[in-house]
């Protein structure tokens, strides 16, 4: 008979009790009632929060947006074609966030920050919420440093500062994207991180922009976030927030960033589609009531941080498309009221060959001259006034046949100044070249030339200055002031080059 040892048995039982570890796992699950058009209605999910991510059986992720008494309205981040009625859905307990790191520079990603350029995974160990709160009043300081765009018309008359939000608005095919991409090209060597967000664009257009950045060496300091026209509405709606989160990562690390949203009209349309499918009540132009908040919470994230937070900045250039120049439509008026000014691009000017087609009369920068270097203020002060007077005179001159000499001179000067503002695409100018160009026009040195000769003359003058008078460039760069010495050097250069140019043209 086997001996039973009670102490041994009790030891074994005690050990088993000590090792016993019961885990209580609570999972918040629901059932799909209906799915279609990028929207799913879920029964259950009682404890789900607004904006929480939910996961379907097939791995598709969605965002819970509508919390109703008997069901939850979820927008899908994918096509949702393999989701079936009756399948289960699990709440994740997380809200949308993306990985962030320096390795994102030079890459093209989607709205979930996943690479779509075929260059492999992006290493990242830090996460940021896609929707993070904007900096408060105490965290900010007023804008005081210039963000040079490389376009004479903007840098002289509608200056943009670091931390500002300046809207680019105009009809389709007026060069809105060109203004934005030129600004990115001009940040080369300026220690500015750029983020270009393409929302609902044609894939070919995005590829063209990326190609331009690559050719011009701008991709190394740029991140492209792209959700093309065939992407689900949810991802088009999220893309700008993803771009802002990537830019914020650098802003809070004491760096200057520039973000371009191309364009917010498409984001508003994607949001309208989601809202209508979720059966939210439509408002003006069928947009939901909170479409203003959609854009305001995005654009308020652009800021110039205070010295306690490291003086980083995020400058936003949102783009909005108008229909037949109607600036009083719903989305344009909303975004105009949120931003610190707007650059208005006119189809008439574009078709008349004035490019960039900036309508200087109704474009404004509400930060203004705080965002200009002193040298630019000194030479460009008279430019806007002269152009405004010229526009008025030009309209008047169409009816009057015999004009006095002074009026004829003013018209001639205006035509040359307008010519001076024309620039080729992807050819941004350094600020010292702009100062020299404007000084030449405003002080009447172009009056001796024919209007057709102005562009050629200015291109050659800028080359002449850089090669023969490098001290001029050095003075403007180092002092940021248009000193007497700089003026003497510039006058000399203009005089020498004008003589040479006129001789050359006579041949």
From Swiss-Prot:
Its EC number is 7.1.2.2. Its main location: plastid. InterPro entries: ATP_synth_asu-like_sf, ATP_synth_asu_C, ATP_synth_asu_C_sf, ATP_synth_F1_a_nt-bd_dom, ATP_synth_F1_asu, ATPase_a/bsu_AS, ATPase_F1/V1/A1_a/bsu_N, ATPase_F1/V1/A1_a/bsu_N_sf. It catalyses: ATP + H2O + 4 H(+)(in) = ADP + phosphate + 5 H(+)(out). The record marks 363 as: Required for activity. It is a peripheral membrane protein. SUPFAM superfamilies: C-terminal domain of alpha and beta subunits of F1 ATP synthase, N-terminal domain of alpha and beta subunits of F1 ATP synthase, P-loop containing nucleoside triphosphate hydrolases. It is found in: Plastid, Chloroplast thylakoid membrane. GO terms for molecular function: ADP binding; ATP binding; proton-transporting ATP synthase activity, rotational mechanism. ATP binds at residues 170-177. Pfam families: ATP-synt_ab, ATP-synt_ab_C, ATP-synt_ab_N. One of its GO terms (cellular component) is chloroplast thylakoid membrane. It is an enzyme of class 7 (translocase). Keywords: ATP synthesis, ATP-binding, CF(1), Chloroplast, Hydrogen ion transport, Ion transport, Membrane, Nucleotide-binding, Plastid, Thylakoid, Translocase, Transport. Produces ATP from ADP in the presence of a proton gradient across the membrane. The alpha chain is a regulatory subunit. F-type ATPases have 2 components, CF(1) - the catalytic core - and CF(0) - the membrane proton channel. CF(1) has five subunits: alpha(3), beta(3), gamma(1), delta(1), epsilon(1). CF(0) has four main subunits: a, b, b' and c. Belongs to the ATPase alpha/beta chains family. This is ATP synthase subunit alpha, chloroplastic.
């Amino acid at each position: 008979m086997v001996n039973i040892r009670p102490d041994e048995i009790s030891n074994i039982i005690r050990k088993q009790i000590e090792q016993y570890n019961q885990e209580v796992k609570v999972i918040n699950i629901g059932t799909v009632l209906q799915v279609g058009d990028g929207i799913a209605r879920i029964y259950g999910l009682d404890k789900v929060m607004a904006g929480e991510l939910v996961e379907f059986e097939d791995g598709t992720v969605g965002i819970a947006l509508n919390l109703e008494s008997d069901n939850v309205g979820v927008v899908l981040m994918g096509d949702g074609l393999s989701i079936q009625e009756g399948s289960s859905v699990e709440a994740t307990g997380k809200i949308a966030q993306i990985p962030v790191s320096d390795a994102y520079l030079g890459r093209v990603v989607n709205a979930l920050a996943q690479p779509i350029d075929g260059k492999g995974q992006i290493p990242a160990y830090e996460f940021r919420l896609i929707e993070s709160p904007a900096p408060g009043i105490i965290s900010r300081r007023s804008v005081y440093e210039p963000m040079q765009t490389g376009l004479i018309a903007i840098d002289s008359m509608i200056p943009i500062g670091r931390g500002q939000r300046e809207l680019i608005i105009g009809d389709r095919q007026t060069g809105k994207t060109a203004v934005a991409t030129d600004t990115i090209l001009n940040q080369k060597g300026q220690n500015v991180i750029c983020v270009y967000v393409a929302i609902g664009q044609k894939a070919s257009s995005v590829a063209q922009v990326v190609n331009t950045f690559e050719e011009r060496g701008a991709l190394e300091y740029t991140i492209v976030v792209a959700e093309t026209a065939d992407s689900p509405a949810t991802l088009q709606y999220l893309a700008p927030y993803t771009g802002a989160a990537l830019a914020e990562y650098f802003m809070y690390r004491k760096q200057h960033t520039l973000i371009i949203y191309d364009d917010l009209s498409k984001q508003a349309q994607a949001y309208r589609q989601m809202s209508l499918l979720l059966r939210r009540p439509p408002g003006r132009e069928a947009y939901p009531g909170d479409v203003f908040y959609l854009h305001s919470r995005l654009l308020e994230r652009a800021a110039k941080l205070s010295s306690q937070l490291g003086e980083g900045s995020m400058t936003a250039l949102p783009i909005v498309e108008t229909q037949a120049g109607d600036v009083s439509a719903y989305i344009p008026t909303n975004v105009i009221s949120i931003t610190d000014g707007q650059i208005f691009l006119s189809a008439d000017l574009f078709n008349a060959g004035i490019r960039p087609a900036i309508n200087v009369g109704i474009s404004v920068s509400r930060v203004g001259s705080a965002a200009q270097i002193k040298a630019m203020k000194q030479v460009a002060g008279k430019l806007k006034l002269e152009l405004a007077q010229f526009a008025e005179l030009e309209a008047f001159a169409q009816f009057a046949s015999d004009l006095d000499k002074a009026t004829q001179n003013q018209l001639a000067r205006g035509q040359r100044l307008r010519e001076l503002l024309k620039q080729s695409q992807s050819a941004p100018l350094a600020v010292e070249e702009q100062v020299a160009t404007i000084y030449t026009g405003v002080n009447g040195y172009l009056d001796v030339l024919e209007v057709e000769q102005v562009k050629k003359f200015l291109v050659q003058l800028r080359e002449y200055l850089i090669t023969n008078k490098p001290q001029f460039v050095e003075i403007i760069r180092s002092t940021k002031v248009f000193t007497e010495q700089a003026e003497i050097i510039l006058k000399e250069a203009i005089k020498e080059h004008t003589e040479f140019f006129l001789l050359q043209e006579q041949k």
